[in-house]
Each structure stands twice: as C-alpha cells, then as structure tokens.
Amino acid sequence: SVHGPEGDSTMLKMTPDLRFRPVCHQCQSPAMTVHSQGHHRILRDLNLAQSQVWLDVTYRKIWCTDCDGVRVEHLSFADVSKRVTQRMARYIHDLCKTMTVQDVANHVELNPKTVKAIDKSYLEKDYGQTEGKGLRILAIDEIALRKGHRYMTVVMDYFTGRIIWMGPGRSKETLDAF
C-alpha cells in the first residue's frame, strides 16, 4: 500500500505465470519463442473501497509465427493500447451513459481526455458501422457546437430520424467523407 496525492492507493505487482505459454494478442496463437522479458505497464483498475488500485504488470514480447513478427503477449484483463483494465474501461463507459465526461473523470480521478477516449472506443465498437439497407431518402443537417464556433454534419434516415453518420465541420469535404 502506498500513499498517493489524494489518499491511499494500492499497487499490485503481477508477473507472468511461467507454467503457461504466452499467447499472441493479435491472433491468439500460442508462441513458441519469447522475444524479450521484463517489460512493464502500469494499469489503473477499479477502486477497492476508497483506495485506488494500480497494477504493475510485467509482460513478455513474443515472436509470433502466424503474424510473422514480434508481438506483445495477450493479457486477458487489458487491451494492448489502454492504460486501464478492461473492467475499469467498462465501468467508465457505463458511467458515461448517465454522467458527463467531466463528472466521470472527477469521480474516477482520471484525465477527461482519457475518459472520453475510453467512452468513444466503446461507442465505436457498439455503433461503428451503420447499415445502409432500406434507406430511401437521406436528411442532412448541421449542428453547432460551443455557441456556433464548431459544427458537425449529421446524415439521417428521413423517415425514422436514425442517425446514419456524423462528421466534423460543415463543408463539402466533410460530406465527401460520408
């Protein structure tokens, strides 16, 4: 247990279980060769009561024969590019359904940009590609953000009002991206 700037926090050290072969994070195939060991990542996990929980994760880089390259071993509790555990990311996304990004950031004591990026990745996963089947008439509108200084172009199904696509700006180039 360590004392952080805002209160108590707990650092858990995690090391690979050498009884098991590492698995490629990209293709999920078992690795025959460990490329390098002793790499570290610090991940934020869910709080335990009033204590922040941090994981000091030691991981290996492997040579994946299927991907034909060096890859990071798969960690079942964390995504390769994130600095929070999957359950912390899910918690943040669930809070964002009913709270503002700033309120969530204050609650979990993370940077608002981090909270927004986590929520955005879940939204893209859940709602990423919209099907265009059955569309007959499109409606195009623009909405102002921040009192008219920035705009979003919105493309909708005219009959249902379902949002098909959104893009930054209100120019021809924005619509061309659609």
What are these regions (language model features)?
Residues 42-45, 83-86, 173-178:
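Short, surface-exposed linear segments at secondary-structure transitions and domain or protein termini
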Residues 116-178:
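RNase H-like nuclease fold core
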Residues 74-81, 163:
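Extended, low-complexity cationic-aromatic segments
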Residues 12-14, 24-27, 64, 92, ...:
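Mobile genetic element proteins and their domesticated derivatives, centered on retroelements
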Residues 72-73, 85, 114, 153:
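Ser/Thr-centric signal marking residues that sit
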Residues 78-143:
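Electropositive nucleic-acid engagement tracts
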Residues 20, 111, 159:
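A generic "binding-loop/recognition-motif" signal
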Residues 1-75:
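Short, conserved DNA-binding cores of transcription-related domains
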